[in-house]
Regions:
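Conserved aromatic-histidine-acidic binding/catalytic patches
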Residues: 45-48, 52, 147-155, 238-242
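Structural alpha-beta junctions
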Residues: 65-76, 161-176, 256-264
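Internal, hydrophobic cores of structured domains that mediate oligomerization or house catalytic pockets
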Residues: 104-207
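Aromatic/basic-lined ligand-recognition segments
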Residues: 181-313
Length: 313
């Protein structure tokens, strides 16, 4: 029996079943980008149409304390404002230190920083992508520092509580762009609060991507964003299965890894798919490998038995 037996079938992805091939030049030769460094800095941009003023310290503390507990502002306000989240202590070699939160001034948003490759993988708001990137000319950058010193589930919840507080502070925010994963999602989708707990991190911070392999019938589904929690991203290289089923499996699998503290080892098996449903009597083997699609990183490759593509040892 595989490690995936208790997960329920999750929400369908907004990614369409028929997707045009992504003809992008691959570059896996570069070193790991800082935004996907395991345990690295969480980075999101709040996108808006008009420039806005930074909230007052009192407004910040009211919203952040409601969501994050004991929060203290420190340092001078300038191009940014900084806070210490005292209920979230990062365990470092020299002892515990509160996680630091930073929120920048509202500044111009350089849309050209998002290349065609990343734009092609914004499945959660594909219908709104172009008008958001053309109309939202301003952004507020928000980050955490030292969050990698928290347990994975605690950091996942903290980051999403932080994000919900930011969207209360910035009601003019139209969309959230996650620099770590390349995911863009409408701010109102988060404001609805239809998802709770650590599920929010999987839905709002992890990007499940889809690629057709030009000249073949092969596809790749992978994730980006799990490395913030010291969890390897997922990769599926396959043919002859509905990609939406695989996207759904990837979201469920990502949630399983987070819920269970990343328990999978090389050679372990997980529940597979039959007619879109996750079933126990089909088992897929897992293996840690190098990513097939940029950025360069280690991934947990899922071998889909007769649907698997490519060469595996």
């Amino acid at each position: 029996m595989g490690l995936f037996e208790k997960l329920k079938k999750g929400k369908k992805s907004s990614q369409p079943a028929k997707t045009q091939p992504q003809n992008h030049q691959q570059d896996l030769s570069q070193k790991m980008a800082p935004e996907i460094r395991p345990g690295g800095v969480f980075m999101v941009q709040l996108l808006m149409k008009e420039r806005c003023e930074m909230p007052s310290n009192e407004q910040f503390l009211e919203a952040l304390s409601k969501h994050l507990g004991n929060v203290e502002q420190f340092g001078e306000r300038g191009v940014c404002v900084n806070f210490a989240a005292h209920d979230y202590i990062a365990e470092l070699k020299d002892g515990g230190v509160p996680v630091m939160l930073m929120v920048s001034n509202c500044d111009e948003f350089a849309t050209d920083q998002i290349d065609d490759f990343r734009r092609s993988q914004m499945w959660d708001c594909m219908d709104d992508r172009d008008h958001i990137l053309s109309e939202c000319r301003y952004q507020v950058l928000a980050t955490d520092t030292l969050g990698g010193g928290l347990p994975a589930k605690k950091r996942a919840n903290m980051l999403m509580d932080y994000l919900e507080a930011l969207l209360e502070l910035y009601p003019q925010c139209e969309a959230v762009y996650n620099i770590n994963s390349g995911k863009m999602i409408l701010a109102d989708e988060i404001r609805k609060k239809e998802i709770s707990g650590i599920d929010r991190f999987i839905r709002y911070a992890v990007n499940v991507r889809f690629f057709n392999i030009q000249g073949t019938k092969d596809h790749i589904v992978d994730t980006l964003g799990l490395s913030l929690l010291f969890i390897e991203d997922l990769q599926y290289h396959f043919h002859d299965m509905d990609p939406n089923w695989v996207v759904n499996h990837a979201y469920n699998m990502a949630l399983y890894l987070l819920n269970n503290e990343n328990p999978i080892k090389n050679g372990d098996t997980i529940d597979g798919i039959r007619e879109g449903a996750i079933v126990q009597d089909i088992q897929w083997k897992c293996q840690y490998e190098d990513a097939l699609i940029q950025p360069a990183r280690a991934v947990l490759d899922i071998c889909m038995n007769e649907y698997a593509a490519g060469n595996r040892s």
